Curated annotation (Swiss-Prot):
<dbReference type="InterPro" id="IPR002105">
    <property type="entry name" value="Dockerin_1_rpt"/>
</dbReference>
<dbReference type="InterPro" id="IPR023309">
    <property type="entry name" value="Endo-1-4-beta-glucanase_dom2"/>
</dbReference>
<feature type="binding site">
    <location>
        <position position="685"/>
    </location>
    <ligand>
        <name>Ca(2+) 1</name>
    </ligand>
</feature>
<keyword id="KW-0479">Metal-binding</keyword>
<feature type="signal peptide">
    <location>
        <begin position="1"/>
        <end position="27"/>
    </location>
</feature>
<feature type="binding site">
    <location>
        <position position="717"/>
    </location>
    <ligand>
        <name>Ca(2+) 3</name>
    </ligand>
</feature>
<dbReference type="GO" id="GO:0005576">
    <property type="term" value="C:extracellular region"/>
</dbReference>
<feature type="binding site">
    <location>
        <position position="712"/>
    </location>
    <ligand>
        <name>Ca(2+) 2</name>
    </ligand>
</feature>
<feature type="binding site">
    <location>
        <position position="204"/>
    </location>
    <ligand>
        <name>substrate</name>
    </ligand>
</feature>
<feature type="binding site">
    <location>
        <begin position="645"/>
        <end position="646"/>
    </location>
    <ligand>
        <name>substrate</name>
    </ligand>
</feature>
<dbReference type="InterPro" id="IPR027390">
    <property type="entry name" value="Endoglucanase_F_dom3"/>
</dbReference>
<feature type="active site" description="Proton donor">
    <location>
        <position position="87"/>
    </location>
</feature>
<feature type="domain" description="Dockerin">
    <location>
        <begin position="673"/>
        <end position="739"/>
    </location>
</feature>
<keyword id="KW-0136">Cellulose degradation</keyword>
<keyword id="KW-0624">Polysaccharide degradation</keyword>
<feature type="binding site">
    <location>
        <position position="722"/>
    </location>
    <ligand>
        <name>Ca(2+) 3</name>
    </ligand>
</feature>
<dbReference type="GO" id="GO:0030245">
    <property type="term" value="P:cellulose catabolic process"/>
</dbReference>
Length: 741
């Protein structure tokens, strides 16, 4: 009762604030006060502290779950800011891994994984009946359709036979029947009300084809007990069944599991280097288990034969595409002994993680317990690397992906369609509103993983792939004299790749064009991470540091931090004009004729409703009046956002710079350079005194110097090589600094 009253008071205050602030929103960006010469380690620790500060609101106060954003009114993949995703949980693990690396305190990694395990991974009570799952009859077939108006889709019990699931028994033998994967979406504050009180609860949204944008979804519970919706809950909005039963169902997004395992790999490596491997050993074991279960994402949706171009049931591994698909899903009855499982026929390059695949295939600490796990991951990570090469455009960007089920109905591919191991090229897998590969962020996210793979393996087969991508992306980054920046935002694709035969052809008929630029802070952080990791890899494996990539990474971090520093001390913040927010009031959400139901708060679900009509609680949000008044004026509302993944991606990039280039420091962007190479003691001169100071620094005598001025060959390090260069300069054997040979 007290908690409910407190929430009501807070909502009343929030509504009052929304009335008082008519234009843009709170906690906007200002210039960072950080001084030149601040180490990237200190920069990371500052941002880490802001993310973890309970007063800043990145985590739920009761469970410690990371929200999608501090702000509640936001619509993108999640349709509410205090909904969260498996993505956010994986970023939490990554944040704590980097913190352990830089401080030696590894407790956060265990905490982050525990929060993940406690909340976003369904436990045995939340997936009852999996022991009744029959891998020889994994699911009942239903067609996919392009548009929500074609749904519900009929379940075809008798007319379509599906293939068999070849991985399930292997996993059961090692771990038991329950899946160890994350469901992708959770209502942390129980805003929709499908759960109990304010307890976090599983929900879902997307169900109805490639044209179903977030604006056209109908949120529904993952555990369907017929409490809300219509007589059959929400089930008959999506599938046409003979009868409907209470049930549960979950869907993963494998890039999140991949990122979590990737982060634990680094935690394990760094902790062992510190002599503290035991501090993360239990988490490593769980990450290895998760990697084994992630093999479920390697298979066609209904286990049909790859490349058949019809509904041909597969046996064994004939249904394995070995890529990371968009999802795997599983479900079953409540109080009944039945369960089902599906894979996914569509693969997007942005979800691939060959680095994680390599970890699961080759690293003993992450070895799968199953009989076939190591073999499958060995095939998978190599197949994923081929996938990137097949999809690399003539310019260098990576195109969308492939499908084994044309139009979601296993139709014949159009004549002339390029293929990859029998799968058809699609520029925008899974979603078309907007196109799933329009967003530049997938380029940075996915290629960062390839950079880590190269860094750890030195595999020369990917050298040309990543060099071409780096050259392309570097040419598209804009650094302005005033210290601001712009990176690609939207991409336009044309043509298609050549059919894959095992060798990259250059894809002269596949092209990408950047159509807009922006300052997405998370993408900027991920891009900086990718470039810095690439630079470190060139030094390790090619004998020559790519200083341009390293310096661009630093520029992106510096400029993102400096220009978007939150005025209220909450990290970094974006200021965004959201023209799409008119869809709050204009976007119709398709409901079949004759169907009616209710949301938990009483909102009516019926034909003709708009997005806001089944989310009327948004009218109580502090941002709502800003959005509504802007809509009435025909303007795009300008709002400030603190996204959890944005903060973490930028923080991790800071940590990467601190790890691989410890002598580099933050520089206020847009200020004239005052660097005097060789002036190690900052007295405005270069002479033998500087040589003495640099020698003491190299010998670790505890002396403080200007490391920017001391890096005389610009390799990101200050060592005896720089001392030798300085001595030669003082003796006039070298005319200018910096000196590169």
């Amino acid at each position: 009762m007290v908690k409910s009253r407190k929430i009501s008071i807070l909502l009343a205050v929030a509504m009052l604030v929304s009335i008082m602030i008519p234009t843009t929103a709170f906690a906007g960006p200002t210039k960072a006060p950080t001084k030149d010469g601040t180490s990237y380690k200190d920069l990371f620790l500052e941002l880490y502290g802001k993310i973890k500060d309970p007063k800043n609101g990145y985590f739920s106060p009761d469970e410690g779950i990371p929200y999608h954003s501090i702000e509640t009114l936001i619509v993108e993949a999640p349709d509410y800011g205090h909904v969260t995703t498996s993505e956010a949980f994986s970023y939490y693990v990554w944040l704590e891994a980097m913190y352990g690396n830089l401080t030696g305190n590894w407790s956060g990694v265990e905490t982050a994984w525990k929060v993940m395990e406690d909340w976003i991974i369904p436990d045995s009570t939340e997936q009852p009946g999996m022991s009744s799952y029959n891998p020889n009859s994994p699911a009942t077939y239903a067609d996919e359709y392009e548009d929500p108006s074609y749904y519900p889709s009929e379940l075809k019990f008798d007319t379509v036979r599906v293939g068999s699931d070849p991985v399930h028994n292997d996993l059961v033998s090692a771990y038991g029947p329950n899946m160890y994967l994350m469901h992708w979406l959770m209502d942390v504050d129980n805003w929709y009300g499908f759960g109990t009180g304010t307890r976090a609860t599983f929900i879902n949204t997307f169900q109805r084809g490639e044209q179903e944008s977030t604006w056209e979804t109908i949120p529904h519970p993952s555990i369907e007990e017929f409490k809300y919706g219509g007589p059959n809950g929400f089930l008959d909005l999506f599938t046409k069944d003979r009868s409907y039963a209470k049930q549960w169902r979950y869907t993963n997004a494998p890039d999140a599991e991949g990122r979590a395992i990737q982060a634990v790999y680094w935690a394990n490596k760094w902790a062992k280097e510190q002599g503290k491997g035991s501090a993360v050993a239990s988490v490593v074991s769980k990450a290895a288990k998760m990697g084994d279960f992630l093999r479920n994402d390697m298979f066609d949706k209904y286990f049909m034969k790859i490349g058949a171009q019809d509904k041909t049931p597969a046996t064994g591994y004939d249904s394995a595409h070995y890529l990371m698909a968009w999802y795997t899903a599983w479900g079953g009855g409540i109080g009944a002994s039945w369960a089902w499982k599906i894979g996914c026929s569509h693969a997007h390059f942005g979800y691939q993680n060959p680095f994680q695949g390599w970890v699961s295939a080759t690293q003993s600490d992450f070895a799968p317990k199953s009989s076939n796990g190591k073999r499958d991951w060995t095939t998978s990570y190599k197949r994923q690397l081929e996938f990137y090469q097949w999809l690399q455009s003539a310019e260098g960007g990576i195109a969308g992906g492939a499908t084994n089920s044309w139009n979601g109905r296993y139709e014949k591919y159009p004549a002339g369609t390029s293929t990859f191991y029998g799968m058809a090229y699609v520029p925008h897998p899974v979603y078309a509103d907007p196109g799933s590969n329009q967003w530049f962020g997938f380029q940075a996210w996915s290629m960062q993983r390839v950079m880590e793979y190269y860094l750890e393996t030195g595999d020369s087969s990917v050298k040309n792939l990543i060099k071409k991508w780096v050259d392309w992306v570097m040419s598209e980054i804009k650094l302005y004299d005033d210290g601001t920046f712009a990176i690609p935002s939207d991409l336009e694709w044309s043509g298609q790749p050549d059919t894959w035969t095992g060798t990259y052809t250059g894809n002269p008929n596949l092209h990408v064009r950047v159509t807009s630029y922006g300052t997405d802070l998370g993408v900027a952080g991920s891009l900086a991470n990718a470039l810095a990791t690439y630079a470190a890899a060139t030094e390790r494996w090619e004998g020559k540091l790519d200083t341009k990539a390293r310096d661009m990474a630093a520029e992106l971090v510096n400029r993102a931090w400096y220009n978007f520093y939150c005025s209220e001390g909450k990290g970094v913040v974006t200021e965004e004009a959201r023209a799409d927010y008119k869809r709050f009031f204009e976007q119709e959400v398709y409901v079949p004729a004759g169907w009616s139901g209710t949301m938990p708060n009483g909102d009516k679900i019926q034909p003709g409703i708009k997005f806001i009509d089944i989310r009327t609680k948004y009218r109580q949000d502090p941002y709502y009046d800003i959005v509504y008044q802007a809509y009435l004026r025909g303007e795009a509302p300008v709002l400030n956002y603190h996204r959890f993944w944005h903060e973490v991606d930028l923080a991790v990039a800071m940590g990467v710079l601190a790890t691989y280039f410890p002598d580099m420091t933050y520089k206020v962007p847009g200020t004239p350079s005052t660097k005097l190479y060789g002036d190690v003691n900052d007295d405005g001169k270069v002479n033998s005194t500087d040589a003495v100071a640099l020698k003491r620094y190299v010998l670790r005598s505890g002396i403080s110097i200007n490391t920017d001025n001391a890096d005389l060959n610009e390799d990101g390090r200050v060592n005896s090589t720089d001392l030798g260069i300085l001595k030669r300069y003082i003796l006039k054997e070298i005319d200018t600094l910096p000196y590169k040979n």
